[in-house]
A protein has these predicted regions:
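Catalytic loop of short-chain dehydrogenase/reductase
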Residues: 76-127, 144-147
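N-terminal Rossmann NAD(P)H-binding glycine-rich loop of SDR-like oxidoreductase domains
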Residues: 3-21
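Conserved Rossmann-fold SDR core element
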Residues: 122-142, 173-176
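Adenosine-cofactor binding site in Rossmann-like domains, unifying the SAM/SAH pocket
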Residues: 22-46, 59-66
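Structural motif
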Residues: 2, 52-53, 83
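C-terminal helical subdomain
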Residues: 149-182
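Conserved NAD(P)H cofactor-binding loop of Rossmann-fold oxidoreductase domains
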Residues: 55-63, 88-91
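NAD(P)-cofactor binding segment of oxidoreductase domains
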Residues: 59-84
Length: 182
């Protein structure tokens, strides 16, 4: 299994990159891919044909949504049927008042909502038969929290690894997973 991914230098990405290290190639600014530049996004899209699956983790503006759209379209045109796993957030489901208390820029949630909307369209575009599979993993509270949030349950690296292994290895089309501890 060969995997191409963006976001391999982020906390979740680093952990996934290390876990799959013999079968994965990361694309980031550190190795020549600037996800704010369309020509670099297009290079990733073209390169993705050489891999079995794509992990779409890097949140750089609208790059995640662009990559999902362009890779899905490119794979469809080339009869490639791998899995495109995008990472969202369950934060998009939280009430506005809670979101504002998190002090995360609202633009982040707007961009993740766009990613989710595109995923919902692509995952049912063709109900049956061979096709690229858009998979969305939405995570709530990854990593240890500090201060007033220190008592919140959080997902750890093994939770994410198990989930990614599940969606990549399962013969069924697992379209969406909401991952959180309660």
């Amino acid at each position: 299994m060969k995997i191409l991914m963006t976001g391999h230098t982020s906390p979740i990405g680093t952990m996934l990159y290390e876990h799959f290290k013999y079968d994965i190639h990361g694309c980031s600014r550190s190795n020549g891919y600037d996800l704010t530049q369309l020509q670099d996004i297009e290079k990733i899209v073209e390169r993705s044909l050489q891999y079995d699956h794509f992990l779409n983790l890097a949140h750089v503006g609208t790059a995640q949504t662009q990559l999902l759209h362009l890779i899905h379209r490119h794979w469809t045109a080339n009869n490639k049927f791998g899995k495109i796993v995008s990472f969202g957030t369950l934060g998009t489901e939280l009430p506005l008042k809670v979101l504002q208390s998190l002090k995360t820029p609202m633009e982040y949630f707007t961009q993740k909502q766009s990613l989710e909307a595109l995923h919902r369209r692509l995952c049912i575009e063709k109900p049956f038969g061979p096709q690229p599979q858009s998979i969305l993993i939405r995570i709530m509270n990854y990593g240890v929290k500090m201060g007033e949030r220190s008592s919140e349950p959080t997902c750890d690296s093994m939770d994410v690894i198990r989930t990614v292994e599940h969606v990549l290895g399962d013969p069924c089309y697992v379209s969406s997973i909401d991952l959180r501890k309660i």
